[in-house]
Amino acid sequence: MVLLHVLFEHAVGYALLALKEVEEISLLQPQVEESVLNLGKFHSIVRLVAFCPFASSQVALENANAVSEGVVHEDLRLLLETHLPSKKKKVLLGVGDPKIGAAIQEELGYNCQTGGVIAEILRGVRLHFHNLVKGLTDLSACKAQLGLGHSYSRAKVKFNVNRVDNMIIQSISLLDQLDKDINTFSMRVREWYGYHFPELVKIINDNATYCRLAQFIGNRRELNEDKLEKLEELTMDGAKAKAILDASRSSMGMDISAIDLINIESFSSRVVSLSEYRQSLHTYLRSKMSQVAPSLSALIGEAVGARLIAHAGSLTNLAKYPASTVQILGAEKALFRALKTRGNTPKYGLIFHSTFIGRAAAKNKGRISRYLANKCSIASRIDCFSEVPTSVFGEKLREQVEERLSFYETGEIPRKNLDVMKEAMVQAEEAAAEITRKLEKQEKKRLKKEKKRLAALALASSENSSSTPEECEEMSEKPKKKKKQKPQEVPQENGMEDPSISFSKPKKKKSFSKEELMSSDLEETAGSTSIPKRKKSTPKEETVNDPEEAGHRSGSKKKRKFSKEEPVSSGPEEAVGKSSSKKKKKFHKASQED
């Protein structure tokens, strides 16, 4: 008897389900179809064997990519090896994707089945999945599916920004539109300004130069010898500048008002700015083509190569086209008209704008266009699928087209393709090595800058952290200094007079010398951490009941006195003991005198 298990892939994890044991799987089809919508009936046929949830969204994305590519992920392998029976011949595993089924059968040895009753079971599992798995709600399952769908689509749409061909498509389309607009606007400026200065149209043929001159001259009656140098800069020809100056003096144009001149100058400036932008866009297109398709650019030119890519939709689509399609790309109307009327098909499309077909004789135009389309197809495939694109192959292919042209004209036999490609391979390897070396240098420089930046950030953070403890110490020292005076006020609050306090105060002022003050300051800084802790605890723990004890405490809390014989480097505890003993002697003398 065959045991049927079904593998279901969900955004939250893998689920392995088992069906009730029957001798023939086909007998399950009507029962499953009836019970798909009813959860109770579906539970009687299908039960959940194991569920393997994904640890994170990244793991879910990895598993989704593996399933789409037909690869058995480690999580799926662990689930199947753990929960499927060891006797593989008695197990039939149902899967929804034939690719993953073939991979499981090849790697793990389980018999896999798709379609038929498996599709109906998976439909029911998809409908009741949140009820089969404990702790899973319909809302959380939908959120997981939405998040995984966005991540999966983002990974599929992601592309390399350095070799994007969509920018080329938009640039060449905008360039063609700008050419039409600049031509139309220039003709409008010629017609508008021609009423005032009609002779300028015959002298200047270039549209951009004409608009610059119309903007500069303005009223022709104000043109004089002082502006001749500027005219030479604009026309880049001294004879034309002199002719413009002479024509302005004897022009047959009508006079024009100031407001009309302002409008003409404003429109001329717009046309000039459009022409300048057109030049910058053309430079941008050339740089992009050298990055994306260097071989195609070297072979047929940047403009024609960009039009081929734009017409095909992408560089990948152009690489997939055969040479016969590349030859007539852009001449679809003529092709279908010829097929409809059973006439001659076109010989060339967009590649007609290359210089090779124009240089060929009329009888050789078809032959050279076919040869050029063949080389364009090869160049586009090299650019599309090479890891480090270089222009070496495009230059060699261009040399071959030149040799073919000379062969048609003079009969000189060109070199063999095998020899040319061998030379190109050697040069391409050298160029690729040079490019990789430059990229490695740039990466090293970038890493050095990153390390310096991180080191500067770490240094700044360490300086900030080192400054904060000092501030905390300063804040903690201030209340400690205030607490030194508190024990002196205790005897006064209790109503007791201490003779040692009144007796010792004038002696302190007389007995301290400069050396003793210096030594006491040094000892206070050395023992600032240990002594204040003792002072802090004494007033809280003990109360003053005897004037003698109060005298002893007040004497011990006063500033420490050191004799000149004692060294400055003595410890803080010894200094405290000596000062307290001296104060005891003074206290006894005062009591005897009383």
Swiss-Prot record:
It comes from Homo sapiens. GO terms for molecular function: cadherin binding; histone methyltransferase binding; RNA binding; snoRNA binding. The gene is NOP56. The modification Omega-N-methylarginine is found at R359. Residues 458-469, 488-504 have a biased composition (Low complexity). Keywords: Acetylation, Cytoplasm, Isopeptide bond, Methylation, Neurodegeneration, Nucleus, Phosphoprotein, Ribonucleoprotein, Ribosome biogenesis, Spinocerebellar ataxia, Ubl conjugation. Belongs to the NOP5/NOP56 family. It comes from the Eukaryota. The modification Phosphothreonine is found at T468. The modification N6-acetyllysine is found at K561. GO terms for biological process: ribosomal small subunit biogenesis; rRNA processing. Involved in the early to middle stages of 60S ribosomal subunit biogenesis. Required for the biogenesis of box C/D snoRNAs such U3, U8 and U14 snoRNAs. Part of the small subunit (SSU) processome, first precursor of the small eukaryotic ribosomal subunit. During the assembly of the SSU processome in the nucleolus, many ribosome biogenesis factors, an RNA chaperone and ribosomal proteins associate with the nascent pre-rRNA and work in concert to generate RNA folding, modifications, rearrangements and cleavage as well as targeted degradation of pre-ribosomal RNA by the RNA exosome. PROSITE patterns: NOP (PS51358). Residues 458-594 are annotated as: Disordered. It is found in: Nucleus, Nucleolus; Cytoplasm; Nucleus, Nucleoplasm. The keyword Cytoplasm applies. The modification Phosphoserine is found at S314, S466, S467, S511, S519, S520, S537, S563, S569, S570, S579, S581. InterPro entries: Nop56/Nop58 (IPR045056), NOP58/56_N (IPR012974), Nop_C (IPR042239), Nop_dom (IPR002687), Nop_dom_sf (IPR036070), NOSIC (IPR012976). The keyword Ribonucleoprotein applies. Residues 580-594 have a biased composition (Basic residues). This is Nucleolar protein 56. GO terms for cellular component: box C/D methylation guide snoRNP complex; cytoplasm; fibrillar center; membrane; nucleolus; nucleoplasm; pre-snoRNP complex; small-subunit processome. There is a cross-link at K87, K230, K240, K540, K564 (Glycyl lysine isopeptide (Lys-Gly) (interchain with G-Cter in SUMO2)). SUPFAM superfamilies: Nop domain (SSF89124). Part of a large pre-ribosomal ribonucleoprotein (RNP) complex, that consists of at least 62 ribosomal proteins, 45 nonribosomal proteins and both pre-rRNA and mature rRNA species. Within this complex directly interacts with TCOF1 in an RNA-independent manner. Core component of box C/D small nucleolar ribonucleoprotein (snoRNP) particles; the core proteins SNU13, NOP56, NOP58 and FBL or FBLL1 assemble stepwise onto the snoRNA. Interacts with NOP1 and NOP58. Interacts with NUFIP1, RUVBL1 and RUVBL2; RUVBL1:RUVBL2 seem to bridge the association of NOP56 with NUFIP1. Residues 292-410 form the Nop domain.
